[in-house]
């Protein structure tokens, strides 16, 4: 396969420029006490707002959507340009169409979609979660499974359509209802991996910059 070196160089330069501009010192010391009232901080373009630490769910009729640390922040579209807002809209719609509630959290301890999903299923009342990386890679996970095991994995993010994301939501809800749905059908393109491999790696590195060791997941209010 012919590699477009000019395009690859441009992608790398753009990402490095963005990363350089967003460098911040990281401190693990406890923040100084403040007398100012705390308010929820908007994330990204404002459709996601952190509203506090995510709590353990008690209702079995919920599925948690656990997103990566840069989702809706440094990255607002997936690897092929689908807006994160649209992706969440479809996943939530799919869950709700099955009569199940959706809860969205942001995970900070890892940028790996499997570990993001595991944090989600541990807090999910049903034990079912959907993990979504900022680049779009998605997994349906179940409490009790090892991180690298799953119910359904969607590794080829460039081939995931909005309709696919909706079907992922529907299947996750069916698992929450203890059903055994047929796996979501997906496209398969052997050239997708080599075509997007460099960009995928760069986007993963970019998301990893937002990992905060030891930080617990945050509940997100979603404005769609």
UniProtKB/Swiss-Prot annotation:
Subcellular location, record wording: Bacterial microcompartment
Protein name per the record: Propanediol dehydratase medium subunit
Protein induction: BMC production is induced by growth on 1,2-PD vitamin B12 medium. By either propanediol or glycerol.
Pathway involvement of the protein, from the record: Polyol metabolism; 1,2-propanediol degradation
UniProt-annotated stretches for the region Targets protein to the BMC: 1-18
Comment on protein domains: The first 18 residues targets this enzyme and foreign proteins (tested with GST and eGFP) to the BMC. The cargo is only detected by Western blot in broken shells, strongly suggesting this protein is normally found inside the BMC and not on its exterior. PduD and PduP compete for encapsulation in BMCs, suggesting PduD also binds to PduA and/or PduJ.
Cofactor: adenosylcob(III)alamin
Activity regulation, short description: Inhibited by glycerol.
GN (gene name): pduD
Species: Salmonella typhimurium (strain LT2 / SGSC1412 / ATCC 700720)
Assembly mode: The propanediol dehydratase enzyme is a heterotrimeric complex composed of a large (PduC), a medium (PduD) and a small (PduE) subunit.
Lineage: Bacteria, Pseudomonadati, Pseudomonadota, Gammaproteobacteria, Enterobacterales
NCBIfam families cross-referenced by the UniProt entry: PRK15042.1
């Amino acid at each position: 396969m012919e590699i477009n070196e000019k395009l690859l160089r441009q992608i790398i330069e753009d990402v490095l420029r963005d990363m350089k501009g967003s460098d911040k010192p990281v401190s693990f010391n406890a923040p100084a006490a403040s007398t100012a009232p705390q308010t929820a901080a908007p994330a990204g373009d404002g459709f996601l707002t952190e509203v506090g630490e995510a709590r353990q769910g008690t209702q079995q009729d919920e599925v948690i959507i656990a997103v990566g640390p840069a989702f809706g922040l440094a990255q607002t579209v997936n690897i092929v340009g689908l807006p994160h807002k649209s992706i969440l809209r479809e996943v939530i719609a799919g869950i709700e169409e099955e009569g199940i509630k959706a809860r969205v959290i942001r995970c900070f301890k890892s940028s790996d979609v499997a570990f993001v999903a595991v944090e989600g299923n541990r807090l999910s009342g049903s034990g079912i979660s959907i993990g979504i990386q900022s680049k779009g890679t998605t997994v349906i996970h179940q409490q009790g499974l090892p991180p690298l095991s799953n119910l359904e994995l969607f590794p080829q993010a460039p081939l995931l359509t909005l309709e696919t994301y909706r079907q992922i939501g529907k299947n996750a809800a069916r698992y929450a209802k203890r059903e055994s749905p047929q796996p979501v059908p997906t496209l398969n393109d052997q050239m997708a991996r080599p075509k997007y491999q460099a960009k995928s790696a760069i986007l993963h590195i970019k998301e990893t910059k937002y990992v905060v060791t030891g930080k617990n997941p945050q509940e997100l209010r979603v404005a769609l």
